C-alpha cells in the first residue's frame, strides 16, 4: 500500500499494511512519525488529529483504506524551528503548552480551522476545537488561534494544509 504523507509517497510493506489498521499506528509505527499522539483510541480526545485532504480527522479511528489516494498531513509538516507556522508562534507567545501531550492534535485542528475560516469567532473556535486538554489551557488556545489568525491576515500567505517541514517543529516528534 502506498500513502501520500506530508507531500511524499510512502510505501508501506504489504505484510504490515492491513487496510483496517488505524492511520495513527501506520504513521507512528510504520513511518516513524511520532508527533501524532495516541490518547484514547475512540476519537474522543483529538491527540491523534491529522489532516486528510485538508480536513482534520482523528487518525486513531481512521483505517488505512479510508486514506488510500488521499493527502495526509501530520504535525511534522506544520512548520520548522527556523520557520514556525504562525499557529506555533502564537502557541509560544500565548504560553499554551504545559504538559504538551495534546498540542500536536490541537495545532492540527486549529490549522484546519484557519484554512477554512481566516477570522473565526470564539463560537467558531469552540466548535472546531473539540480536542481535550487535561491541563485546561482552553482560554490560551483560543487566544493563540486569534493571534495566529491576525498574523495570517497580515501576511500575504493564506493558511493551507501545511507543507513538509522539519520534524522537530513545535508540536512535532518526541
Give names to the regions the model predicted.
Residues 1-174:
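Signature of N-terminal electron-transfer/Fe-S-associated modules in redox systems
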Amino acid at each position: 500500500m502506498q500513502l501520500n504523507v506530508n507531500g511524499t509517497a510512502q510505501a508501506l510493506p504489504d505484510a504490515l499494511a492491513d487496510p483496517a489498521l488505524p492511520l495513527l499506528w501506520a504513521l507512528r509505527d510504520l513511518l516513524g512519525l511520532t508527533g501524532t499522539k495516541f490518547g484514547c483510541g475512540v476519537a474522543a480526545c483529538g491527540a491523534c488529529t491529522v489532516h486528510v485532504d485538508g480536513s482534520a480527522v482523528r487518525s486513531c479511528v481512521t483505517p488505512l483504506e479510508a486514506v488510500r489516494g488521499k493527502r495526509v498531513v501530520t504535525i511534522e509538516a506544520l512548520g520548522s524551528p527556523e520557520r514556525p507556522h504562525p499557529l506555533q508562534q502564537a502557541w509560544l507567545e500565548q504560553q499554551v503548552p504545559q504538559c504538551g501531550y495534546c498540542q500536536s492534535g490541537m495545532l492540527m485542528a486549529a490549522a484546519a480551522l484557519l484554512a477554512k475560516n481566516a477570522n473565526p469567532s470564539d463560537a467558531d473556535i469552540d466548535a472546531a476545537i473539540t480536542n481535550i486538554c487535561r491541563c485546561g489551557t482552553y482560554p490560551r488556545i483560543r487566544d493563540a488561534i486569534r493571534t495566529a489568525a491576525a498574523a495570517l491576515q497580515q501576511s500575504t500567505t493564506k493558511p493551507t494544509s501545511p507543507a513538509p517541514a522539519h520534524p522537530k517543529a513545535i508540536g512535532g516528534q518526541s
